[in-house]
Every structure is written in C-alpha cells, then in structure tokens.
A protein has these predicted regions:
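N-terminal nucleophile
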Residues: 1-253
Length: 253
C-alpha cells in the first residue's frame, strides 16, 4: 500500500474503517484479493513476483497493512521482500505486539517499511525508521510513505475526507472508493522532499496516482462493525482501458 486511511474506535457503528490505495508498477503481476488456497482463513491479494501481500485479514480476526518508507538513497538491492511481513503475521501464532517486537531485531535488513498489525480490537505500529512498537490510539489516522500521520498533503486531505465520511450513520463503501479516487496534485509549495526530485514528488502527491508506468493499481475498503462483521471490498483498476472490477467479501470474525 502507499496510502492507508483508517478510523479506529471512532464511530458508533464501526470498530474499524479502512480506505487504502495500493501503488505499484503496472507491469508487476498481482493476484486480486481472495481467500488463499492453502491458508483458507486468510483474505488478501498476492504479489505474484515475491509471493507476499500488502494488506490482509484473517477469519481469526488478525489484520495487517504495509507501506514502504520512501528513502531512495538507502535502497538495499539484496533486501528481503517486505510483503512477507504481512503474510507472516497473519500466519504466525503471536499477538501483534510480540510479532512486532521480534521484528525489531531484524528490521534493518529490510528496505524502509511501515507495518500495522493487530486484531479487530487493538492495533500496533512499527517501522524500521522509528524506534519501538507503538499501540495506535483511537481516532482517524493516515499512513503513506513516511511515518504514521506525517502531514503530507495526501495524508492530510485523506484524513479530512475520511472524517467527513464518518458523519454518516451507515458508511457506504462507494463513498470511500470515491475519496480514494482523488487524482488532484498537491501544490508545489506543500510537497515533501524525499529525494526523488520535484517532478516525481508532484506525480506521487495525489491520493490516486496515475502515470505512464506506475500508479494506484487497486483500492481497498474494509468495514468492521461492533458485532465483528467484516465487509472487505477491493477495486482493481485497468489503466489500459480505464475500466475497473470489484470483489466483495462478508464474514464474521
């Protein structure tokens, strides 16, 4: 993922509301969200090249989400795949805090990442560009390719739009897909400097990214209500012909 917006214990009907965009090279082969064949309790997409995933949930109530930390000057060519951090947690028997504490020791071997792990009742956050494992507080949060709640333009706008969507008693998944499909560029004066150059900073600044070779490949919406009923929807975009397809799942945890 490259943008994760979420509301945690901040709505009278929902424990957790997630709206996220996955940005990736168009040529990278990806399998849309599905219940995995061998690990049939896990619902997630799959990166066909490295075998990991970027976001997933299990019928046992475990949830994990990943973004990369943008630091182009410190890319390690031989680093292990970050996508396995998500799938390993979903498969592991440890609770989120224990899993992330164990990851602290090996975190530096990976290229930059942010990882949220938890259950539907408690979330923790760890990234290898910050110290320690942190329990996430209630409220609205945003995570892109910097630390949690870093006020990049897309994060600030996304959080504000999500907060507005939370005013509804019943949240429509389509309203969350609509806020994710925002391709307006940030003002140049508001752009971060992450070392990729001004032109690329501008290209990467919208909530929904479009370019000739890289962009927002899919959007995911997850709603978990107070009775632990999960709605999981993923919309995949075909940039070649401007079409999209949506898969939807509902289950109890």
């Amino acid at each position: 993922m490259c943008l994760i917006l979420f509301s945690y214990e901040n709505h009278p009907r929902y424990k957790l509301v997630i709206a996220a965009n996955r940005d990736e090279f168009y040529a990278r082969s990806t399998q849309p969200a599905h219940f995995w064949e061998k690990e049939s309790h896990i619902l997630a997409g799959k990166d066909r090249e490295a075998g990991g995933t970027w976001m997933g949930i299990s019928k046992k109530g475990k949830l994990s989400m990943l973004t990369n930390f943008r630091d182009p000057m410190n890319i390690k060519s031989n680093a292990p795949s970050r996508g396995h951090l998500v799938s390993d947690y979903l498969l592991d028997g440890d609770d989120a805090y224990s899993y992330l504490k164990n990851l602290e020791a090996s975190g530096a071997t990976y290229n930059g990442f942010n990882l949220i792990c938890g259950s539907i009742d408690k979330l923790h956050y760890f990234g290898n560009y910050q110290n320690g494992v942190h329990e996430i507080s209630t409220g609205v949060h945003g995570l892109s390719n910097a630390l949690l709640n870093t006020p990049w333009p897309k994060v600030k706008k996304g959080k504000a739009d999500l907060q507005a969507a939370l005013e509804a008693e019943t949240i429509s998944p389509e309203s969350l897909f609509n806020l994710l499909y925002d391709d307006v560029y940030a003002k140049e004066s508001d752009l971060p400097d992450t070392g990729v150059g001004l032109e690329k900073e501008r290209m990467l600044s919208p909530l929904f990214i479009k370019s000739s070779h890289y962009g927002s490949r899919s959007s995911t919406v997850i709603l978990i209500d107070k009775s632990n009923r999960v709605q999981f929807l993923e919309r995949t975009y075909n940039i070649a012909d401007f079409t999209s397809s949506t898969v939807s799942f509902e289950f109890q945890v």
